[in-house]
Amino acid sequence: MLCLAVAGPVTGPQVDITNNHWQFDAGKVAAAMNVRAYLLINDFTAQAMAHRDLLQQDRSLPTNHRQILRGGTPDHSTPLLVIGPGTGLGVAALVPAGDDIKVIEGEGGHVSYAPRNPAEEIILAHLAKKLGHVSAERIVSGPGLESIYHCQTGNHRPAPDIGALALAGDEAGLAAVRLMLQSLGTVAANAALSFGTRAGVVIGGGVAVKLSAVLGDSGLIERFDDHGRRRPYLQSLPIYLSVDPLAGLRGAAAAIDNRYLARRIILV
């Protein structure tokens, strides 16, 4: 049995990878690996499944795979939001369903970017000239961080270098990182309100964990809470940081045993 998690919308065995030119055929991969059955899921479905223990007891997961960024008063009978920037912006939710859970496999990274201040409006205008529609993941992602830095400084740097500058205290690097993380706060709050999340929010993906040293004073949580009449609602939600480098693999393994995802298993 093989579970494959790929970065693109899954509607069949062939998937176009969102942020590069690759095409992926799960049936051909399964045949090449000589397996009799496979399950194909979105990569952030796998990330979300790695945090199912926040809704149901599961002793198979390590106890140190998350850090608490902000405590709260969770209601575990409601959806859990899992969101995170990497090469794109992944968004998924886990919903309690009897003695199991369902995964809402959304494309929330492609909602329209909503600036909240003049600096963000400048970034939006800069990208709109090139792209037309500017989705959230054009800003809240590794490539998004590069776009922010270029717009603010006129210089091109890869995202790891910008992150390293920020961690070293470089003013320009910090400014770019803070804008990206505050924008993540906006998108995460919008998603939490849309899903009716009360179980909490898990921030995953490869970018946030590498910037964990500056998360506390980045303004991310303050921006997350800054939603007018629903501030008390959002302030009640615990926020976690996923620090498990194997989260995707653990979640993919768990997907095979999930009652609802297992219905999509294809026999070769």
Place the predicted regions along the sequence by residue.
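Short beta-strand-loop/turn "lid" adjacent to the catalytic site in phosphate-handling enzymes
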Residues: 1-40, 45, 49-58, 208-213
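Gly/Ser/Thr-rich active-site cleft segment
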Residues: 2-21, 25, 99-101, 118-119, ...
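Short beta-strand segments
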Residues: 3-7, 41, 81-88, 92, ...
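ATP-dependent carbohydrate kinase catalytic cores
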Residues: 11, 38-72, 159-178, 186
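Active-site nucleophile and cofactor-binding loops and adjacent substrate-binding regions
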Residues: 17-20, 39-46, 71-73, 82-84, ...
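Short coil/turn connectors at secondary-structure junctions
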Residues: 34-36, 76-80, 197-198, 236-237
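Glycine-rich phosphate-binding loop of actin/hexokinase-like ATP-binding domains
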Residues: 64-67, 76-135, 212-213, 220-225, ...
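ATP-binding/phosphotransfer module of carbohydrate and carboxylate kinases, centering on a glycine-rich
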Residues: 118-268
